[in-house]
C-alpha cells in the first residue's frame, strides 16, 4: 500500500481524511484549484507551502468556515458535506485558528472556554455539567497540558500566549476525530511550545 498517498484518486483503506479536487474562489482570486489532501489516523500531517498558497484556506474548508467550495471530503471512508462549523463539529473535526481573539469568548472564564464545545453539545440534554465539575475537568486538562492558568480566570485577563494555550486546550478537550492546527504555537515561546 505504500505511503499515505492517493492511488489514482481512489480512497486508500484506513484513511481518516481524504479531500478530493477541492476548489474555492473569492472575488478576483482562485484560492484553491483542485487541491488534494489525505491523512491516516493516529498520525500528524503537515501542509507546507509559501504564504498565500492556500494552506489556511484548505483548513478552513474542513472547519466549515468556507461553505462555497467545490470537491469532495471523505471522513473515515464516508463522504461528508461540511458547509458550517456545526457540520465540522458534528463530524468530529476541531480547529485551532491563528486568530485567538475571535475564537475565545473574553467574558467567560478559562474553564468555561475550555469546556465550551462540550457544554454546547450537551445543551438541552440531561447531562448538563455542573459548574464545579466543569472547572475540575478544565483544571485537569490544563494541568495535563502544562498550562499554568487558573480555570476561574477571565479570558480577557490573559496574555496572547495564554489565550493561544487555552484555545489548544479547548480543542483537545473534545476528543475529536480530527484536530486541525493552523499555526497553533506561532504566538508561543520555544519553552511554551515544548511544554505543550
Regions found by a protein language model. Give the residues of each.
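Glycine-rich phosphate-binding loops of nucleotide-dependent enzymes
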Residues: 9, 13-196
Amino acid at each position: 500500500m505504500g505511503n499515505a498517498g492517493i492511488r489514482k484518486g481512489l480512497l486508500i483503506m484506513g484513511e481518516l481524511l481524504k479531500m478530493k479536487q477541492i476548489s474555492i474562489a473569492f472575488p478576483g482570486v482562485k484560492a484553491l484549484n483542485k487541491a488534494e489532501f489525505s491523512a491516516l489516523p493516529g498520525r500528524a500531517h503537515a501542509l507546507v507551502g509559501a504564504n498565500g498558497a492556500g494552506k489556511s484556506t484548505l483548513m478552513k474548508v474542513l472547519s466549515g468556515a468556507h461553505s462555497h467550495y467545490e470537491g469532495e471530503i471523505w471522513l473515515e471512508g464516508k463522504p461528508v458535506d461540511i458547509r458550517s462549523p456545526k457540520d465540522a463539529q458534528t463530524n468530529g473535526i476541531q480547529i485551532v485558528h491563528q486568530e485567538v481573539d475571535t475564537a475565545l469568548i473574553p467574558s467567560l472564564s478559562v474553564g468555561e472556554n475550555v469546556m465550551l464545545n462540550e457544554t454546547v453539545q450537551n445543551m438541552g440534554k440531561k447531562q448538563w455539567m455542573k459548574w464545579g465539575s466543569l472547572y475540575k475537568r478544565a483544571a485537569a486538562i490544563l494541568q495535563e497540558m502544562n498550562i499554568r492558568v487558573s480555570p476561574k480566570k477571565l479570558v480577557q485577563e490573559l496574555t496572547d500566549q495564554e489565550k493561544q494555550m487555552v484555545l489548544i486546550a479547548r480543542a483537545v478537550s473534545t476528543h475529536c476525530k480530527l484536530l486541525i492546527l493552523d499555526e497553533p504555537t506561532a504566538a508561543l515561546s520555544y519553552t511554551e511550545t515544548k511544554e505543550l
